[in-house]
Amino acid sequence: MAEAYVVEAVRTPVGRRGGGLSGVHPADLGAHVLKELMVRSGVDPAAVEDVVFGCLDAVGPQAGDIARTCWLAAGLPEEVPGVTIDRQCGSSQQAVHFAAQGVLSGTQDLVVAGGVQNMSQIPIAFATRQAAEPLGFTAGPFAGSEGWRARYGDQPVNQFVGAEMIAAKWGISRRDQEEFALRSHQRALRAIDEGRFDRETVAYGPVAVDEGPRRDTSLEKMAGLKPVLDGGTVTAACSSQVSDGAAAMLLASERAVREHGLTPRARVHHLSVRGEDPIRMLSAPIPATAHALKKTGLTIDAIDLVEINEAFAPVVLAWLKETGADPDKVNVNGGAIALGHPLGATGVKLMTTLLHELERTGGRFGLQTMCEGGGQANVTIIERI
């Protein structure tokens, strides 16, 4: 049976909105991790057969197939192509899936997967709102579709509404969310202080550590914030941060490992993606995880570490309730509430952390999942070698 191996993975530190990476062109952010990936892996860049990058809101400096632009901006061989994909927040996790599928199919031997996002420069949903307004489209991407309206009516398609729906359905209180958010910051700060992220990150100029975690946060401070929606429970403190960053990883076939003298660090054990209610939007990791475990024959207890994106605290808390996963195995170094969520880069960012943490702890299986626009969720299971 063919295998897809993870050879190397690296990310930038995640910058806060308006922080140390905010003025960096997205192509240069992506180029930075690509250059480092080639150096760390030792592979001949000309042997790479494709570069698959995730990126949302592909307008302005993020337009024009940024995967290709990042590669060229890195000074790497022109004969290597690139393609940019958009599965919303799961874009670069899907990039890993496409890269792995190319390797598993036998049609490719060396593929780079990654992602980049500068949310300081291009705000979230800019492509669906502000960029469309000069063309007369002012009500979002679903307005005007007869088929959509016939199926879903005029229900709001909004991530904050989805987070509140999850909190209500699974009985998750504001206090539950705030305690989870505080723990995310505490875990992230511990990871930074202990140097757990040092191997997986490459500094960009003076930005050497993740900028998001707050040492001065507390339950008391969180309790003073207004909910995002009137009468709701979700506040900014329980939500992922607006962020800037990039990440990249190299996947290889058995033949490439042999011919290029590479050392595989993990194998892709499973990859899948599922969908559900696009209005609730953010709960798809629950059925997607169940699907993945059934397909592999694994139990949740067989998974040593989990990275589930902390888009909002209710997303992870509902997932924990449904799966019965041990919270001490989940987001052990904090998550997007503390560390940030650079949209199109987050999938590979999380997988980079998962790989390095499996190596640090000696774990075998790591599972990654995340909620995505449209009510979707990717699941990837990697096995440390």
State each model region's role:
Residues 1-24, 36, 142, 220-283, ...:
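Condensing-enzyme catalytic core mediating Claisen C-C bond formation in acyl metabolism
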Residues 11-12, 23-32, 40, 176-259, ...:
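N-terminal extracellular/periplasmic Venus flytrap/periplasmic-binding protein-like
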Residues 22-111, 116-134, 201-209, 279, ...:
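Conserved beta-ketoacyl condensing-enzyme motif
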Residues 24, 55-109, 153-159, 216-241, ...:
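Conserved catalytic cysteine-centered active-site region
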Residues 27-42, 66-70, 95-98, 159-166, ...:
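Short, well-ordered amphipathic alpha-helical segments that serve as non-catalytic structural scaffolds
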Residues 87-117, 167-196, 248-255, 342-361, ...:
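Active-site-proximal alpha-helical scaffold in enzymes
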Residues 110-165:
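Flexible glycine-/small-residue-enriched beta->alpha junction loops
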Residues 162-164, 200, 204-207, 269-338:
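Active-site pocket-lining segment
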